[in-house]
């Protein structure tokens, strides 16, 4: 499976349900083939929405991981405490592949949410069962939030 970006849909405006439904449909088809291994191509995937990565990882993870922590977002001391834990989604169990082995193809463009999929599956599948093939990834297994850091003003016609 080639995965180019973790995006919910056109302009990412309220397509979360559509995205999840499409993923469940696709993985129902995969599950009917009873795979014990899966090849995931993340070569040109710069990341995107963590919730999309969470959905994909929930479909690939061992069934025993469902409902357990996928990742925890930890904020620094300057930011109001907003630490959040995202769990593997247990409602995906009917489509979950319960894989024994995952092969992930990477490149120097693989980043962020893509790296989260790799790193967050390893504790549940084991390092030997999440096999990374390809180039070293960006090394940005973190997320970002935007904040306005300066006041925007218009020039005034003062003398």
Question: What does each model-found stretch correspond to?
Answer:
Residues 1-38, 52:
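Flexible, low-complexity junctional segments that flank or bridge functional domains
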Residues 4, 26-33, 59-63, 105, ...:
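Structured segments of extracytoplasmic/periplasmic soluble domains
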Residues 5-9, 43-50, 108-112, 136-140:
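Solvent-exposed loop/turn segments at secondary-structure junctions
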Residues 19-26, 49-56, 113-120:
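Stable alpha-helical elements in mature extracytoplasmic
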Residues 33-38, 66-67, 99-102, 126-130:
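Loop/turn elements at helix/coil->beta-strand transitions in domains of secreted/extracellular proteins
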Residues 47-101, 143-146:
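Gly/Ser/Thr-rich loop/hinge elements
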Residues 126-136, 140:
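Acidic/polar loop patches that form or flank catalytic/metal-binding clefts of enzymes
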């Amino acid at each position: 499976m080639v995965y180019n970006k973790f995006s919910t849909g056109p302009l990412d405006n309220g397509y979360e349900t559509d995205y999840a439904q499409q993923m469940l449909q696709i993985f129902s088809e995969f599950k009917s083939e009873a795979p014990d291994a899966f090849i995931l191509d993340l070569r040109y995937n710069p990341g995107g929405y963590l919730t999309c990565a969470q959905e994909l990882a929930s479909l690939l993870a061992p069934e025993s991981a469902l409902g357990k922590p996928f990742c925890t977002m930890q904020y620094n001391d300057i930011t109001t405490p907003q630490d959040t834990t995202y769990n593997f989604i247990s409602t995906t169990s009917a489509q979950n592949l319960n894989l024994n082995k995952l092969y992930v193809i990477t490149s120097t463009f693989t980043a962020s949410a893509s790296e989260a999929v790799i790193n967050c599956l390893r504790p549940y599948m084991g390092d030997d069962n999440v096999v990374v093939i390809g180039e070293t990834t960006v090394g940005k297994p973190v997320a970002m939030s935007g904040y306005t850091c300066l006041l925007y003003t218009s020039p005034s016609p003062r003398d």
